[in-house]
Amino acid sequence: YLLVVKFKNVKCKYYNNFISQSKCRNIVGGRYDNGRIIQAESFEMTLTDIDFYFILSTYDCQYEIIENYYSKYNYLPKQFIEFVLEKYVNKTQFKNVQGKEVEYAKEKNKFNALYGMSVTNMIRDEVVYDNKNGWSERPLSNDEIVEALENEKKKSFLSFAYGVWVTAFARSNLLKNVIQLDEFVVYCDTDSVKLKQGYDKKIIDNYNKFVENKIKHVAEKLDISIEKFAPSDVFGEKHMLGLFECETEKGHLHTYDKFITQGAKKYAVEVDGKIEITVAGVPKQGSKALSSLDDFR
């Protein structure tokens, strides 16, 4: 389902919060944590069935469905799945191989581009420039949007829904683990979770077993070799698609002495007295400007 929903009397049940303020309209009485809604009197959202059911499980709320569009679930085309897996196999086999840096970069770019190709938004407001007023944007009318969508439908070869629902499933899979590890989560991104010591590792292990079973089922159902879902790297280690890997087990490098974050894509760590930063748009060398983590603001 694709839904337009009005939520009322909304309050999160967990320490972490999940509804992005930027994805909501007409917010009344909102309280926020790093751009995510803690509670609100009301707001409207356009969202998938995956996101809708996740919100109902993590927030106390009332709701009214304003619009509802439906389609039948099915697997992606087998040819497309096999192409995705081919890029994943190549990327994994070229990673950390001396002399194959260019090949690795190319395969990684192709692998990542498969998602971007399905969610490129071609329906944009018209940007206008004149010598008197400078730059401005003119919102498209409904008729212009419909015309643009019809034209785009004739040119596009991938469904926009591929990317939308892949994102929804990935977000749901990540956040279902976050709510079980709630008080131990200090940071999470699109594909990773940073945790305090003392968390229950069985939660991650159980999730990984769940993914392994699903992949085995899909491989058998679609008659695709299971090896394509779990290629080996140059060191002979298998990397099954979709599993959480514990970086701490790979050495002290990923066990931080100190960690600080100012929000999504903005954090710094200290290991053995050395500071490293991860900030969108800022080079790693920017860490030289910090004498301590207290300076990271």
Segments (PLM) and residue ranges:
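Conserved acidic
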Residues: 1-297
